């Protein structure tokens, strides 16, 4: 049996093509990136000037001839020059840090916004195959990991390569023999990076995958805590969570191992070179073939070389995590939106006139997959203002059929028409403004009653909200709340009863004044007294509107103009009472 929490991220090589995909998000801030690059060049120039000043201070005033006062004065000027260079470098470093952080966070903000927008527009079939915890990890942790790539990773790494080349030229100009000795370190670091590349890549991918799985499982456990407590399964659930937590911890420890081994070997290679440089350079100074100041200058320039060499190795492995996150983030950004764009590039016909609509199903088929056919040749028409009750056994395709009206899914065969126009040819936003959908498995958002009824749409005034609440008979209850419409709603509406949540969801559908109402067992969770009030209100609410209602209650079926019986995905009966 497959694990529902299994990581579905692709396994593949890290592609620099991700940078090309990232560029559209970075392009608006390219001037700031250019400024950062300019700061790096100026800072590097100052780094080269500092050792040059020290060399001339050592080989000049400190070792030269002449009066002591003049030599001290010259040494002081050299000291001031070195201090000025150091302060200027520190100031530029501060500005560089601010700019890179500013740039990185803005790109991250735009990526996260695009990713969330893509998740909102992805088809239901995509979301049904994912877990909320995985997608949350993509939008939060994975996107944040890109900051290392955007802020300093690529820019700093490219500049470090240029820096290494420039420093090598200077080292060979100062002393060819010592320069040849120092460059022996570079191939060693490159070899180590290549050796650990594959293992580090796999380790980081494993960490991202395990973390996503743990988040998914955590979200499900929190959502199902009542069921866990009711059946006394706290210990069993805690044990399962401990197993997944342990797997995540083991994945992190694997990355720590690769980091530790890599950094230790690189550091060992660089320190060995430093010892050799001290021996050979010191010998040359004692033999008089190399000036002390020149040796100090070479030593400091070697620091400018070894630093970037080590940082390149570190960044290469740190960037593995960023590229692993890129793999997931851009995988989601590539997920097609639903509804898909029209082949001719048009936005879709405008929605037909407002008013009670004619809803027609013409030989409609629907399948969730090659071997998961749900609807087969469904044909019927709901005339304007007519209420049709859809009944049938579990699994007959009732909920699927209703979802096709507002184009939550597309039929795989035949067509669904609104006032004679295929819903696939209508503007999706205008179509859904005309069709209101109320599901049995409703969802209330964290916020206020007002937010949930008008669904965060500020153009819907409170008068319309009160009218919708009155229609479903819950306005007195809302008025009794201490804060009325501003009363807080907990996550998933946990502060209200199931029946109250259902009525609020029904008011949400009515507040947009739809032409077509699609009710999927909308009264299933309401008690008999509340249902009696609702049925009376529905008679007025449905007047002048077309309605498709999935219902099991006899009272709901009796109120319908027609009854449609589904069985095995087919219409087996269609008629009145």
Could you tell me what each predicted segment is?
Residues 1-47, 62-82, 96-100, 104, ...:
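Membrane-integrated ABC transporters
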Residues 33-92, 172-177, 272-275, 286-292:
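Transmembrane helix-loop-helix hairpins at lipid-water interfaces of multipass membrane proteins
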Residues 64-65, 170-184, 254-327, 332-333:
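Helix-loop-helix
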Residues 28, 32-45, 155-205, 279-290, ...:
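Transmembrane helices of ABC transporter permease
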């Amino acid at each position: 049996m497959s694990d529902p929490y299994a990581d579905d991220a692709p396994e593949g090589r890290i592609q620099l093509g991700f940078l090309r995909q990232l560029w559209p998000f970075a392009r608006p801030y390219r001037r700031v990136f250019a400024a950062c690059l300019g700061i790096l060049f100026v800072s590097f120039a100052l780094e080269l000037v500092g050792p040059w000043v020290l060399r001339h201070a050592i080989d000049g005033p400190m070792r030269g001839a002449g009066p002591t006062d003049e030599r001290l004065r010259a040494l002081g000027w050299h000291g001031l020059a070195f201090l000025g260079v150091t302060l200027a470098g520190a100031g530029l470093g501060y500005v560089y840090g601010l700019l890179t952080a500013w740039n990185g966070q803005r790109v991250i903000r735009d990526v996260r916004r695009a990713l969330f927008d893509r998740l909102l527009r992805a088809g239901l079939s995509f979301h049904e195959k994912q877990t909320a915890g995985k997608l949350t990890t993509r939008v939060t942790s994975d996107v944040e990991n890109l900051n290392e790539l955007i802020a300093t990773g690529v820019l700093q790494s490219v500049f470090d390569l240029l820096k290494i080349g420039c420093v090598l030229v200077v080292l060979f100009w100062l002393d060819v023999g010592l320069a040849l000795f120092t460059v022996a370190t570079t191939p060693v670091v490159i070899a180590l990076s290549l050796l650990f590349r594959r293992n580090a890549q796999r380790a980081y991918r494993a960490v991202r995958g395990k973390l996503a799985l743990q988040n998914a499982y955590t979200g499900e456990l929190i959502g199902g805590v009542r069921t866990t407590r009711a059946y006394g399964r706290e210990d069993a659930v805690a044990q399962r969570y401990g197993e997944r937590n342990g797997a995540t911890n083991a994945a992190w420890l694997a990355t720590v191992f690769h980091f530790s081994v890599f950094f230790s070997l690189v550091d060992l290679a660089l320190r060995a070179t430093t010892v050799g440089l001290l021996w050979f350079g010191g010998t040359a100074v004692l033999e008089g073939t190399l000036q002390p100041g020149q040796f100090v200058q070479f030593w400091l320039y070697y620091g400018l070389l070894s630093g970037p060499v080590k940082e390149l190795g570190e960044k290469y492995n740190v960037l593995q995590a960023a590229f692993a996150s890129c793999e997931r983030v851009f995988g989601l950004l590539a997920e097609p939106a639903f509804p898909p764009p029209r082949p001719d590039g048009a936005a879709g016909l405008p929605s037909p006139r407002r008013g009670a609509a004619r809803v027609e199903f013409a030989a409609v088929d629907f399948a969730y997959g090659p071997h998961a056919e749900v609807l087969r040749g469904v044909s019927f028409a709901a005339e304007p203002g007519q209420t049709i009750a859809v009944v049938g056994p579990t699994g007959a395709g009732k909920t699927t059929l209703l979802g096709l009206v507002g184009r939550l899914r597309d039929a795989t065969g035949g067509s669904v028409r609104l006032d004679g126009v295929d819903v696939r040819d209508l503007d999706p936003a205008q179509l859904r403004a005309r069709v209101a959908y109320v599901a049995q498995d409703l969802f209330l958002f964290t916020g206020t009653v007002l937010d949930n009824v008008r669904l965060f749409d500020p153009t819907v005034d409170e008068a319309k909200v009160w009218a919708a609440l009155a229609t479903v008979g819950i306005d007195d209850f809302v008025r009794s709340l201490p804060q009325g419409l501003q009363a807080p709603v907990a996550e998933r509406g946990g502060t209200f009863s199931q029946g109250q949540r259902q009525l609020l969801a029904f008011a949400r559908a009515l507040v947009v004044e739809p032409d077509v109402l699609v009710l999927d067992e909308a009264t299933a969770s309401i008690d008999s007294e509340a249902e009696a009030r609702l049925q009376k209100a529905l008679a007025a609410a449905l007047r002048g509107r077309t309605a498709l209602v999935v219902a099991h209650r006899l009272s709901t079926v009796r109120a319908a103009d027609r009854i449609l019986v589904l069985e095995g995905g087919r219409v087996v009966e269609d008629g009145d009472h």
